[in-house]
A protein has these predicted regions:
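Bacterial N-terminal signal peptides that target proteins for export
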Residues: 1-8
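Acidic/polar-rich alpha-helix caps and helix-coil junctions
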Residues: 3, 19-60, 92-272, 294-457
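Bacterial N-terminal signal peptides
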Residues: 8-16
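The N-terminal extracellular segments of secreted preproproteins, especially immediately downstream
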Residues: 15-18, 70
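Transmembrane alpha-helical insertion/packing segments
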Residues: 61-65
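Short alpha-helical hairpin
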Residues: 67-91, 298, 302
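Active-site core of glycosidic bond-cleaving carbohydrate-active enzymes
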Residues: 261, 271-272, 278-293
């Protein structure tokens, strides 16, 4: 979709593609912004991209779903591949390089607003600064998940960039430093008490993304605290089974338990493209191991009919969204890793009651035995899967199918390797492919910038 974008920035910035250069802004005959309204045009461009479904970098869009679901194992590429739908991460490296570069352009825009409006006491300034901190924090979270290895605090992180310096050559630092920096960005956004929905990133949306950050970085105490806060105080409730299909397949509305989503503008000029994208995704059936999670009577689980047709092809709206059910699933897993197994199971059952008609609560004694043919065989700590954790993973896979989650679950839990056959050739997803490479031009410009393992140029 990149060739379809029409950038209509009110301000023109001159930038280069390297990390050091494209974060620098050099006015060339342009009026430097001064008023709140002039700075607002920078952030509103980014917000409009989210609402119209053009944004791939903050909340994400259908293109991002197509990539993540195509390269994961939710769809069975061994049965059917398509030239219109990704199937192997190794074929997508060039696209991920574009994602890396374009993400930094958004960081640049956020830094412009933060650097010039922070401290102004107008409601417009505070709204813009809060949104900028939130967007920048989400970009860093996304970059960490895609361009860093699975969480290990001393491994390389993402360069930390606060201002514009054409001579700057920031190093990657560590993942712990990236986590602490990103957490601080979210805290700065929350400190401004954002409530205006025109800036999209209100308090509960920011807290949800902060919970996702804590979850990725395995800070289970923080996950428990934030998720309980959202569940208890946000006013959002798990969508009941009777309303699930309407909520999950709403074309452009934010319904029920959805805290935030992309593509809420139903008059987007890209709607024709999204229609094609949905058709591309529906050219590959769901894999049998996903389908079997719905049991002998899949029609009792409302997620099944809302996700698949009779031939296992996708019918679920492929949108990037953040929902309360994800908070519940993160909470269950956090309790599990803290050793509070009963609380973990309670939340699994709470979700099941809102998804499966006539659901019977699971107990420790009735949890199914661990399946030996699953792709994920160890958790994020390298420990063997248990029946309870398998139940959490099963609900997560069913719940967040076609929302871009499975690829990162595979990465987070052991980076299993597997292969698909296409046109008589075998394509193997190696462990290193779960982490995209840092842009080569940045490595060439800054020899101190460490490349990710597995990539040589």
């Amino acid at each position: 979709m990149r060739h379809l974008r029409t950038f209509t920035l009110a301000l023109t910035f001159i930038f280069c593609v390297s990390c050091g250069n494209y974060l620098n802004v050099q006015p060339q005959g342009q009026v430097i912004p001064k008023t709140d309204e002039e700075f607002a045009s920078i952030i509103h461009k980014r917000l409009n991209d989210i609402e119209g479904g053009e944004d791939e970098f903050v909340i994400g869009n259908m293109d991002m779903i197509k990539y993540l679901e195509g390269c994961s194992d939710n769809l069975d590429a061994n049965i059917m591949t398509s030239s219109f739908l990704e199937f192997f991460a190794g074929e997508e490296i060039d696209k991920r390089q574009h994602f890396y570069r374009d993400s930094w352009k958004i960081v640049r825009d956020c830094n412009i607003v933060i650097g010039n409006l922070a401290g102004r006491d107008t409601e417009t300034a505070k709204g813009l600064v809060s949104a900028s901190y939130a967007i920048k924090g989400i970009i860093y979270y996304n970059l960490m998940r895609e361009f860093c290895q699975p969480w290990e605090e001393n491994l390389p992180g993402i360069p930390l960039v606060d201002n514009f310096d054409i001579d700057s050559r920031p190093r990657r630092g560590t993942m712990k430093q990236t986590y602490e920096y990103t957490e601080k960005l979210f805290d700065e956004a929350l400190a401004l008490n954002p409530t205006d929905k025109k800036y999209i990133f209100t308090t509960w949306v920011i807290k949800a993304y902060k919970a996702k950050l804590e979850f990725w970085c395995q800070n289970w105490d923080n996950v428990i605290s934030i998720c309980n806060d959202i569940i208890d105080n946000s006013g959002y409730l798990l969508t009941p089974a009777s309303d699930y299909a309407a909520m999950i397949n709403a074309p452009s509305e934010t319904k029920g338990e959805v805290l935030v989503r992309s593509h809420v503008n139903n008059s987007s000029g890209l709607d024709w493209y999204f229609s094609y994208t949905k058709n591309y995704i529906a050219t590959r059936p769901a894999c049998a191991k996903l389908i079997r999670l719905f049991g002998e009577n899949p029609s009792e689980d409302v997620r099944y009919a809302a996700s698949f047709d009779k031939k296992r092809f996708n019918v679920k709206m492929p949108e990037c969204r953040v929902r309360l059910s994800e908070m519940v699933l993160m909470l269950a897993e956090a309790y599990y890793h803290k050793g509070e197994k009963d609380k973990a199971l309670d939340w699994v059952n709470e979700l099941r009651r809102n998804r499966i008609n006539g659901a019977i609560d699971l107990t420790m004694s009735t949890l199914p035995a661990v399946r030996t043919d699953e792709r994920i065989v160890v958790d994020c700590k390298g420990m063997a899967i248990t029946p309870l954790l398998q139940a959490i993973f099963d609900e997560r896979r069913k719940e967040l199918y076609m929302e871009g989650d499975r690829w990162f679950e595979l990465k987070r839990n052991g980076r299993p390797e597997w292969w698909v056959i296409s046109n008589g050739l075998k394509f193997t997803t190696k462990a290193y492919l779960y982490t995209a490479p840092i842009v080569k031009s940045d490595i060439d410009l800054n020899p101190d910038l460490e490349q990710n393992p597995g990539y040589e140029y």
